[in-house]
């Protein structure tokens, strides 16, 4: 990975041939090349996209098994592949990284635990050769995601930054099943992969888990910022604290984003919506700044709980919906921030107006009438 490359250098003829209509061709993520997981090194892939279509560990509304498909569909809409220059950050991740879609992990609707082990194996394969970005699936996939990623890289102590409406630290989840989507953080903690002091939760609200679980979290040194606290605080302060905690004495950092952290008006397509969540500008800004502050070579990311059956403007996932489109945007933002971190930059080369922001000198204002 060097900052001398361009998208054309990385993708060659595929870059030039990518501008086919969005409704044609193989619907990989962003219409990127599909590369078998055992071929990532041969193809010089830097970031591997992996689907984890598991939802049998959910507890309320199922449907996230279709999340990877919907996010891939949404990813074909905004702009041509390999061309994602961000006017705000001034970076196009495809000028820095070679990215490929590695398909989906094998899942069996009749065997939740075996499906999770299959996901762990698939993430391990990706992580041996590339940075994993995983699309869920319910939130139970994050435990095998982290297990496979850590084992492939020899990480013994990881930091975790967790965006979610729920803490997911239940000893036996929500149902008495220790591997359901409400227990994965506790599984990571119990495996001694993460110290409580290296964990930060952003956005919890509502009525689960109960006070006993939060007391245990506090005793373990875990920290959280509720959705209302996020709304009333400086986002940069939250980001700085979460990053400092996640990187203090750790080998690497995983960021996990559950779309139910969002206000349901902006992310209706999920299994357990809860009023009072984050708005997109808050979430995008914090994810952008968190990832930019981390080492892209010791990093992993997943976005989970996209359930397209409940989404707005999604009919059979032909082009995705509001929620799947938001998940797609997060992934592109993550890759853009990784590219900035790889280059050691706070920002790329955003294109600014000739005049500074604010009223032009010739513009009349109400004060001029006094």
Where are these regions (language model features)?
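Conserved alpha-helical scaffold segments that buttress catalytic/binding sites
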Residues: 2-370
């Amino acid at each position: 990975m060097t900052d001398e490359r361009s998208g054309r250098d990385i993708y060659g003829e595929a870059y030039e041939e990518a501008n086919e209509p969005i409704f044609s061709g193989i619907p990989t993520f962003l219409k990127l090349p599909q590369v078998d997981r055992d071929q990532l090194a041969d193809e010089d892939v830097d970031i591997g996209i992996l689907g984890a279509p598991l939802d049998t560990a959910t507890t309320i509304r199922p449907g996230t098994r279709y999340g990877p498909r919907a996010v891939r569909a949404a990813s074909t809409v905004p702009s041509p592949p390999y061309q994602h220059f961000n006017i705000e950050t001034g970076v196009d991740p495809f000028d820095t990284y070679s990215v490929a879609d590695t398909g989906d992990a094998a899942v069996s609707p009749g065997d939740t635990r075996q499906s999770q082990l299959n996901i762990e194996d698939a993430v391990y394969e990706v992580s041996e050769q590339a940075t994993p970005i995983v699309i869920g699936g319910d939130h139970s996939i994050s435990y095998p995601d982290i297990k496979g990623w850590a084992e492939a890289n020899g990480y013994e102590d990881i930091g975790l930054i967790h965006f979610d409406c729920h803490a997911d630290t239940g000893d036996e989840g929500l149902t008495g099943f220790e591997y359901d989507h409400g227990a994965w953080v506790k599984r990571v903690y119990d495996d001694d992969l993460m110290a409580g002091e290296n964990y930060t939760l952003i956005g919890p609200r509502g009525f689960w888990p109960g006070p006993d679980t939060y007391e245990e979290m506090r005793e373990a040194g875990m920290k959280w910022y509720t959705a209302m606290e996020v709304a009333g605080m400086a986002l940069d302060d939250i980001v700085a604290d979460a990053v400092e905690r996640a990187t203090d004495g750790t080998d690497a950092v995983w960021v996990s984003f559950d779309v139910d952290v969002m206000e349901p008006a902006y992310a209706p397509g999920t299994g357990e919506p809860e009023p009072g969540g984050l708005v997109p500008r808050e979430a995008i800004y914090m994810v952008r700044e968190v990832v930019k502050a981390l080492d892209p070579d010791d990093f992993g990311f997943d976005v989970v709980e996209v359930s397209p059956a409940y989404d707005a403007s999604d009919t059979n996932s032909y082009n995705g919906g509001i929620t799947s489109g938001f998940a797609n945007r997060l992934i592109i933002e993550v890759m853009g921030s990784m590219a900035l971190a790889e280059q050691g930059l706070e920002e790329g080369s955003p294109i600014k107006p000739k005049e500074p922001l604010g009223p032009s000198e010739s513009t009349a204002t109400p004060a001029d009438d006094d």
